[in-house]
Structure formats: C-alpha cells, structure tokens
C-alpha cells in the first residue's frame, strides 16, 4: 500500500520550502519517495528504484534496448526540457531578472517545442 502526499509548489511560498520537507529533501523539489526508511529523490532515480524493488510489476521494458529507449526519453525531459522551464527557473526569471511575462512565455514555448519535437522524432524512429 502507498500514500500520496501532494506538495503544493506555489501556495504560501511553496510547501517544498517548509522545514519538514526540507529535512527530507534538501533540494526542496518534488518528487520525494519515502520507502522502508529510505528517502529517494529525483524522478528517474525513483523509477529505477521502483523497477528494481518491485520486479513483479515492471515499469521498464524487459529488453535492454527497450529500457535504454525509455531512459533516453525520460532523460530528454529531465535534462533538456524540464530544468529550464521548471518553477524555480521561471520564478528566478520573473523575480530576479525581471523578465516580462511574454518573454518568459516565449522562452517556455521555445524549449518545450524543441524538446518535444526531438521526442516525437525519437518515438517515430523507434517503431
């Protein structure tokens, strides 16, 4: 059995910045998985952990090439799309650099479109 505990990233300055959450995850980011006394962070690390810990319900394909393709797609999002469009970056652009809302929107749309175009090409070529 598992229990989800939502973390509101904006309300009251972001629940991820509260002392209790910071004690679990010093990065003050989501997700954080607590399992059997272990505190795990980062989506891909959690994916790998769950896949290895619960092999009867695999999250990754059985073959090495299939697993590599899934990891490549996940890393495309985790490394190329998400980091430059996440909430911390957008708040920094707004608060510290005073980048106007329309420029932030253009920034976001550009990097998301570029990343997903690459992802679509990879998906088409993997058939």
List each language-model region with its residue ranges.
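Cytochrome P450 catalytic-domain "roof"
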Residues: 30, 122-127
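Amphipathic alpha-helical packing segments from all-alpha helical-bundle domains
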Residues: 105-124
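GST-like domain detector, emphasizing the conserved glutathione-binding G-site
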Residues: 1-106
